[in-house]
Amino acid sequence: NPQTMKQATLDLIGRHHTVDMVKEKFRMARDLGFDNINMDLIIGLPEEDIDDVRSTMEQVRELAPDSVTVHSLAIKRAARLNIFKERYANLKIQNTQEMIDLTAKYAREMGLEPYYLYRQKNMAGNFENVGYAAPGKACIYNILIMEEKQTIVACGAGTTTKVTFPAENRLLSKTVDIIPKI
């Protein structure tokens, strides 16, 4: 997932992928026959403005994903922007209605329709996250995850498995710190 198509921003926020890698892997997935590809974008990333959002949307439109999820920046506990917040204190973070409207306009132009919306804590601009999809390409998994109705099994160090118990309206989360030797 690209988050943005501005390389300077990816570098700033500590992402280890490049814009070129995103494009290359997207095309590779298409060449391998993947027919339902989503791209996650984040609006409100440090030092990005409306022109950067427009540039990202132009590049995403060229790739023609089957769905796009537009997230408003929410700084997570373990995010680089939170861990090193003193270093980033003077960075400009914008998330405006104009940016949100621009992403919706591009989604419509790409033939994508909104199919789910959710809010989370600590979101820049107090906006929401919106999933857009082409007809017949909506991902029910995304809806179930947001409603915490879907079990997620994670493998690897630092991952979190969530087990749902719908009949009991209960959720169990477990983070894997160390993988035991088998």
Language model features: what each stretch is:
Residues 1-103:
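Conserved non-cysteine loop/helix-boundary elements of the Radical SAM core domain that shape
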Residues 3, 42, 118, 156-158:
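Anionic group-transfer/hydrolysis microenvironments
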Residues 64, 111, 123, 149-153:
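A generic secondary-structure signal marking the coil-to-beta-strand transition
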Residues 75, 122, 158-161:
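Short, solvent-exposed loop/turn segments at secondary-structure junctions
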Residues 106-119, 153:
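Acidic/polar loop patches that form or flank catalytic/metal-binding clefts of enzymes
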Residues 119-129, 136:
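Conserved catalytic loop of SAM-dependent methyltransferase domains
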Residues 131-182:
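Radical SAM enzyme core and accessory elements
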